[in-house]
């Protein structure tokens, strides 16, 4: 029961305990399918057109072709003095092949998750018959695919909404579980800025609507989401492009170094075969991060999708990691939104107990959190009646009446609702409105609460004070953001005194009271003028300019079409609080990329000490063979086997992301160097030595 908004959805219906084993089973089957599809896709990505998009792995791909050639013809580049060169070159070719394949597999697994989500979205699309409404009121059944922007359709209970649109007449409950996963229906009505947008593929479960189509065939919300999560040509983010260029430059430097080695080797009387040169190049270039870079970026979008948020691009997710300022609405983001009964205020000479009694009767059939809180507050005062459900009848809240209540035996009527609605109800029954009601109304409003008037028949007994509760743990989350250098600004329509109290309780850095939609744009522009990146949420048409202005704009799925088109992310659950989680995911993406880059470059140090000393053994460089590797063949194979296996070993970390901690930039740098820098040096030393021992045991040294 909320006279100012649709009935809240029941979040508890989302996952019952009995559903969880089946859900886990489905998840396991889905994951298995992703990996099976990725195996095939990894082979498809071996074609040159795909391989050349990754400069680092393309060098490995070319090296594989070269070693395959010398496996077939060992003397292709001159006479070799190796023992059994075809066996060594064949093993080397196999290792290089799997190095490329593992990198492709990592990218294919990350892409597979997006394809699985696209399949889920595609399953909601079905061609149905739509009731096309002509200007003269005639209804014609037409295929939904023939609808175009501007058409008007009529939908009734049980119908699937044929296309995206705006409600222009009617009020109805809509099941959006096919898109959001939320089983509770959502109220849609005309004339509401945030509840008038409907999505094709959802189903009406009660009443009827007249909808104006806002999207041509193939350009609806679901179509756009499928294209986004399944797009074959993923646009790299600016940071990803910069890192790719850096890795390519490093690879070219190492290529130049390796290309000049034969000259030095000739004067050192230590000739180097072409397969060894290829192996040395592959060992030195940053193949680990080169093989996982695409997977990290794709997985970032996937982690956002797991929160039921669709990002228009990886650029949007990455921008979240650089956000400096969050602009947040108070209601639903900082406060619960489901206001709870705080106090009964009597008027017209009535007592608190009398107000509580009428409020209890008017709310006893109300199953919303607000209605239940009114009953609880009344029962704390000792109020309770034994109502016969067969004789009393509950009256549900509706957007038209803006009130709810109970019809009692004998024709008596108890109602609660918006003050204006109750005034109209009482006047229609020849009741009297006193100035005390307006005084109580202002008293509650000045405290930032919502006033509900309570009446029995044509007599108003008093006002219920509904208080908006600050969300539990929100202060700690803002503290975490503050430690990361993210500033929070609360926008609210409340007066300055109320806004100040809530801001202090929630722990935001700044607030703007009595805010208008224009204030949102002003705040965003002010912060951006200071060189900051800004994120915000919105759902109404009046939020669209601010969503477009923000670096990260998250639109609610229940919002208007204009808001969703202006934003670069859409939250299918319509939960504004998710903005905080999205920012954390963006920062986790950047941290993961930085950590694995550090680890990959540190790996090269160990591989350098593994191969160089044994290649130039006759040049008195054995003192650098700190791992005491058996032979040149053993050192090369050990380093490259490690080089290949570390890629699949790090796939789970690349997909899941490095554990995120709210630390400062200096603390993050120190942590990365200690764990992934030092660890990246030590781990390959140990692994390469163990592999060398195994190779020696099987006689390949």
UniProtKB/Swiss-Prot annotation:
This protein's source sits in the domain of life called: Bacteria
A Pfam family cross-referenced in the UniProt record is E1-E2_ATPase
Entries under InterPro entries matching the protein: ATPase_P-typ_cyto_dom_N, ATPase_P-typ_P_site, ATPase_P-typ_TM_dom_sf, ATPase_P-typ_transduc_dom_A_sf, HAD-like_sf, HAD_sf, P-type_ATPase_bsu_IA, P_typ_ATPase
Reaction equations catalysed: K(+)(out) + ATP + H2O = K(+)(in) + ADP + phosphate + H(+)
Is Translocase a UniProt keyword of this protein?
Answer: yes
Instruction: State the UniProt keywords alphabetically.
Output: ATP-binding, Cell membrane, Ion transport, Magnesium, Membrane, Metal-binding, Nucleotide-binding, Phosphoprotein, Potassium, Potassium transport, Translocase, Transmembrane, Transmembrane helix, Transport
Listed transmembrane segments:
57-77, 90-110, 245-265, 276-296, 599-619, 635-655, 681-701
Q: What is its EC number?
A: 7.2.2.6
A GO CC term assigned to this protein in UniProt: plasma membrane
Binding residues for Mg(2+)? 539, 543
Q: Which residues form the active site?
A: 329
Query: How does this polypeptide assemble, per the annotation?
Result: The system is composed of three essential subunits: KdpA, KdpB and KdpC.
State what this protein does: Part of the high-affinity ATP-driven potassium transport (or Kdp) system, which catalyzes the hydrolysis of ATP coupled with the electrogenic transport of potassium into the cytoplasm. This subunit is responsible for energy coupling to the transport system and for the release of the potassium ions to the cytoplasm.
Q: Which family does it belong to?
A: Belongs to the cation transport ATPase (P-type) (TC 3.A.3) family. Type IA subfamily.
Descriptive protein name: Potassium-transporting ATPase ATP-binding subunit
Q: What is the protein's species of origin?
A: Anabaena sp. (strain L31)
Whichever gene encodes this chain, its name is kdpB
